[in-house]
């Protein structure tokens, strides 16, 4: 437990980093879908690597379109820094791998299992396993970002995490981060990608030096640079991409498959086209790193590559984690673990390459953003577009981080300050994360260490979520977030960032705003990673956490000068939050997220508070540096904001689904300054619209794939990311949906892109939806969901006939949470397709309409509702597209809510479980119920909403929707009901175990406190007696007179003394009882 504190710190830091990383990773992933996970890594690592790459890559712009976003997100402006980064990155990478090798492995294994769901594990296992282990560690660090995802596993993870994580993890994490970044850079450079492992290693030393000596600054820079670099890359887009792709995937897009295999890059690869380079490099290096880290450990096999997705995941994780900081390495690992978990689901879901990617993203996020990575990966999987989404996912993952973050928080809490706030309090974790971020910011030490800083970014990205996962930054990212962010988590943010950054570059100032937001995102995710970045927004919780973190981080960073990084971290966090953040996961949304975060805040006050602050900070002080970032990121933010925001938000949302909504809300508000994104914000709305566009944009989607895709994907991921949190994965799964997701991203992108350009717009549009959907989805099945989602998606997609598809989906959902998600996604996809028009439209049209408003409302509402709404909203779009899906989506949404509620984590988990069941039920309504359980009132409302899926604010619409849902449900209800019951039982058990765990921890804390008080009391009594003995009669008489007179000294003291013990006792008994 004690370790946990450190772990926590590490985790938080990791999360932060994770989240940030996530965010970045997300970016990267965005850059390269395939890179998704790698991307995530890239984001952080690549950020470093990428940046350098970016510079190098710039020339090859064409290929790099996606990367540009990453670059953009990173920081278009700083190519030079990137170069520096490069060195750094490489050094880092190398270092990372090294440190990670042993540590990470451990982490992976420990956490992975717990975190990862069996399915996830299997999916991610090949790569995941290594990663998983990492992830687990990461989770631990992150706050059991992943754990959260797997409700049951969470506990284990927590435990394992506490144990596993410990300081070492953190250290390794940090190292990993360093390595990771280093590696990433090389990857980014591209040459290394294939070699990633070796080159990185060799570089390691050099880079390390840089890192150590320069790293710090570099890192800081790094972050900035990365962001900037990314920006550049992004802006250059192509070059970056190419470089990245090349690096990562030597092959480049073509290589993608291979690359994918090769290293995380592989995942990246798939995504590669999107932003493989970045991603790849990221993944590549990161993968390498991961691999190195992990591979060195066991990871090699993971090779992250092994499962492309997984690989990526690993990478991502590493990124988030690695980035996080060397220490974080362990953390990272933890993050990774988380990621893995998430990823696993993603992996599971993604198992397809796409999935894998998804997974990667998640991982990123989870890492805290590892998770995010996974998400991104997932996105990737779906296709390039998916890849992009993947990137987003990454962000998301931050979210998982975020989600994870939530849980993580609990865990973290116990570890670091268990008694401070209920374990269950997400805030706690985030706060921790925040602290961490602060630390991070402060960490500057660490951050300074390149790793740290990057991590921060990563974290932001992550917390995810990651995570953001992570948590704060990565918190879970998720570190936890990531994270989750931030988890939870980052990628999305990153992606968004990338895009946004691109945009940013284009519209830096606006971007600035956006960035700020975004940064917030990242920050959030980072912290989360996940995380705060909400990504990692990984926190995801992490993100959210991250967000919080971010805020703090922001502060810190701002104060420290880390600011920039912090910003990034923040961004990451934000992303993450969106992520990681989360979750992310949540942070990501940062941009939007920021707003989101605010929103987030709403949903997750804790986070959100942090987030908002972050937001403010971003805008305010950070702006300066943050602005830098901000600018860079801003764009991202902006972009993010738009779609991403959503995503980001989602990330955070993912962190908290709410975030998403929030994001959206925020978005809607235009909040983020992002306003540009505003639209983004609108995103939600826009998304909706876009979503609507989706249908229109179906093409967009396809288009997306190419460049757009990346972006969209990125965004989708973001969206996904946002979702991620819990569902990040799901999201990702959806991402698999990705197409849809991508679309969503697109949608999101559009805002950003729109800013950037029409195409993106179109792309963006759809993505937005998807994103949202994803979000919904994400939440719903955090890990599983994703997988399911993916599966589902296919079906859904296949099923296009929404109605049927929907039901199937519903059923599918029953079978798998994912499915629900899937369906959602699928709905998305479908919706994207015709569904939107068709089914949705018919039944849903109104709903959509409602949705939209609801969206806003929901958003406002709350996060939960907002989320719901958002989800729904988007779903609405989707919903529109598909009634059922909508419903499902909503459920997802609900799920999100739940996640958001987090309810907390537990609720979320339970909900997830339920969700799994419920979703199946189409029972969105049920899901909602489940959600409601988790969410409680909101949830319920949501549920209703869900039911009313159509109406996001379903509450109002409920009647309408419900019927819809109900009707649809009925067909699948028989089995669904049973499945749901089972799920509910499982969820209850899970909750029970979690509660027991939490209670035990609290009791322990209280016992210790009581002990301390008793000791103190006895000591005071002894002192009193001694004083009495020593005192002269005159003095005593005086004293007595004073007492009688009412002099407080003695009297008060004794009373005070007595009271404390009494209180403790009562406390003890209370808790004990």
UniProtKB/Swiss-Prot annotation:
GO terms for molecular function: identical protein binding; transcription coactivator activity. The keyword Glycoprotein does not apply. Residues 1-98 are annotated as: Required for interaction with TGFBR1 and promotion of TGF-beta signaling. Gene3D superfamilies: Single helix bin. InterPro entries: TSC22/Bun (IPR000580), TSC22/BUN_CS (IPR047862). Residues 257-271, 742-764 have a biased composition (Polar residues). Residues 1006-1027 are annotated as: Leucine-zipper. Residues 220-240 have a biased composition (Basic residues). Induction: Induced by cytokines including TGFB1 in aortic endothelial cells. Keywords: Cell membrane, Cytoplasm, Membrane, Mitochondrion, Nucleus, Phosphoprotein, Repressor, Transcription, Transcription regulation. It comes from the Eukaryota. Residues 58-70, 614-625 have a biased composition (Pro residues). It is found in: Cytoplasm; Nucleus; Cell membrane. Ubiquitously expressed in adult tissues. Expressed in the postmitotic epithelial compartment at the top of intestinal mucosal villi. It is a peripheral membrane protein. Forms homodimers. Forms heterodimers. Component of a complex composed of TSC22D1 (via N-terminus), TGFBR1 and TGFBR2; the interaction between TSC22D1 and TGFBR1 is inhibited by SMAD7 and promoted by TGFB1. Interacts with SMAD7; the interaction requires TGF-beta and the interaction is inhibited by TGFBR1. Interacts with TPT1/fortilin; interaction results in the destabilization of TSC22D1 protein and prevents TSC22D1-mediated apoptosis. Interacts with SMAD4 (via N-terminus). Interacts with ACVRL1/ALK1, ACVR1/ALK2, BMPR1A/ALK3, ACVR1B/ALK4, BMPR1B/ALK6, ACVR2A/ACTRII, and BMPR2. Transcriptional repressor. Acts on the C-type natriuretic peptide (CNP) promoter. Acts to promote CASP3-mediated apoptosis. Positively regulates TGF-beta signaling by interacting with SMAD7 which inhibits binding of SMAD7 to TGFBR1, preventing recruitment of SMURF ubiquitin ligases to TGFBR1 and inhibiting SMURF-mediated ubiquitination and degradation of TGFBR1. Contributes to enhancement of TGF-beta signaling by binding to and modulating the transcription activator activity of SMAD4. Belongs to the TSC-22/Dip/Bun family. This is TSC22 domain family protein 1. It comes from Homo sapiens.
